[in-house]
Design a protein with these regions (language model features):
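C-terminal accessory module of base-excision DNA glycosylases/AP lyases that mediates lesion recognition
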Residues: 1-15, 19, 107-118, 124-182
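Structural motif
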Residues: 12-23, 33-37, 74-79
Length: 182
């Protein structure tokens, strides 16, 4: 078990991601069309602005004002506020408000995959990335089957490792764009 992840330059945000399972899920939900650092600082901003990361409270609160407050939580505040609210509702209704039950109550790797896939905003890439973080940073044995062969956030164990991961990811995206244009 880790005491902090290294997805942001903010120690408080990193500690929150490691100690509050809903923060981790929210960070992954926000991780699209913004830098990793922005996405994973989002849960701390939400907690500071709303006062809690309680799933029931987030599911029943209009989060858009908190998302729009400067600096915005995400570049698409309305859409992502709704996504986080939907995610919190699933955690509240299906897991009794305990986000960690997504993985602690899973019967096997296939069940864990389904549980993650059923979360709002979680497609195949996020299933693998969250699986890698759960397996490599939180020692969740059932998540081993979800770990892809390529580097993911699960491999990030320091600020330098995050920088290297992002550099490789940018190079890979550029290579893919070049192939599409050829």
């Amino acid at each position: 078990m880790t005491s902090a992840l290294h997805f942001t330059p903010n120690d408080e945000a990193n500690a929150l991601l490691a100690t509050e399972p809903l923060a981790l899920l929210i960070g992954f939900a926000l991780d699209q069309q913004v830098p990793v650092q922005t996405a994973f600082t989002g849960p701390l901003k939400i907690k500071q602005r709303v006062g809690t990361l309680d799933a029931h409270m987030l599911a029943t609160t209009d989060l858009e004002p908190a998302f729009r407050e400067k600096p915005a939580v995400h570049r698409f505040p309305g859409t992502m506020a709704k996504r986080v609210q939907e995610l919190a509702a699933v955690v509240d209704e299906d897991y009794g408000g305990h986000a960690e039950r997504v993985w602690t109550d899973a019967k096997d790797g296939a069940d864990l995959r389904k549980r993650i896939a059923d979360l709002p905003g979680f497609g195949e890439m996020k299933i693998k990335a969250l699986g890698a973080v759960l397996a490599k940073r939180f020692d969740v044995e059932l998540a081993q089957d979800l770990v892809p062969n390529h580097p993911t956030l699960g491999d990030v164990d320091s600020a330098q490792a995050l920088e290297e991961y992002q550099s490789k990811k940018r190079a890979h995206k550029a290579e893919m764009r070049a192939k599409r244009q050829a």
